[in-house]
């Protein structure tokens, strides 16, 4: 009985610490929730944008990782989730030739569901702004903004990311 009571007490103390960041982030206007466990996802690729001086790391859930490693990304499988974490570029303070992540800008999520997201090429789009992860877009239709750019990547299944080769 003492062991059960001790276990219960320890569980009650640790449970709040185990809560996910995703539990505290608001759902977007189109109903997409911040993915649980995203901080533990694996890298698919990275990219830089010269037009807005930002860098990105693209992560994937297990379905996306398996598809990217096996070359099965056109089309991406239903259930694949891509997460893009975006930072402003910053010069490394001790090495001026190096660019490192600076201020965090936003997170973007693409969820592959060919039946649910028919108006956006089979992808659900979501974005959360800043370190406080405030949902972007007040109306459900904000995803059309995302798709307006992504439709130019039709030949690669509406995804700009090219999976990086990992030897």
Predicted regions and their residues:
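Positively charged n-region of N-terminal signal peptides that target proteins for export
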Residues: 1-6
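Bacterial N-terminal signal peptides
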Residues: 7-16
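Sec/Tat signal peptide C-region and signal peptidase I cleavage site
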Residues: 18-22
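Sequence context surrounding c-type heme c attachment/ligation sites in exported
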Residues: 23-54, 73-167
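Short, structured beta-strand/loop micro-motifs enriched in basic residues and often containing a Trp
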Residues: 54-67
């Amino acid at each position: 009985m003492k062991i059960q009571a001790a276990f219960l007490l320890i569980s009650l103390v640790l449970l709040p610490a185990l809560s996910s960041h995703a539990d505290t982030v608001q759902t977007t206007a189109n109903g997409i929730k911040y993915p649980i466990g995203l901080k533990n996802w694996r890298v698919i690729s990275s990219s830089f944008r010269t037009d807005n001086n930002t860098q990105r790391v693209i992560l994937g859930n297990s379905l996306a990782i398996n598809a990217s490693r096996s070359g099965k990304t056109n089309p991406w499988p239903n259930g694949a989730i891509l997460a893009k974490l975006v930072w402003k570029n910053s010069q490394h303070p001790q090495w001026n030739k190096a660019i490192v992540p600076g201020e965090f800008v936003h997170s973007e999520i693409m969820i592959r569901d060919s039946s649910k997201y028919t108006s956006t090429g089979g992808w659900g789009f979501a974005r959360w702004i800043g370190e406080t992860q405030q949902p972007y877009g007040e109306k459900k239709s904000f995803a059309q903004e995302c798709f307006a750019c992504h439709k130019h990547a039709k030949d690669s299944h509406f995804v700009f990311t090219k999976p990086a080769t990992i030897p």
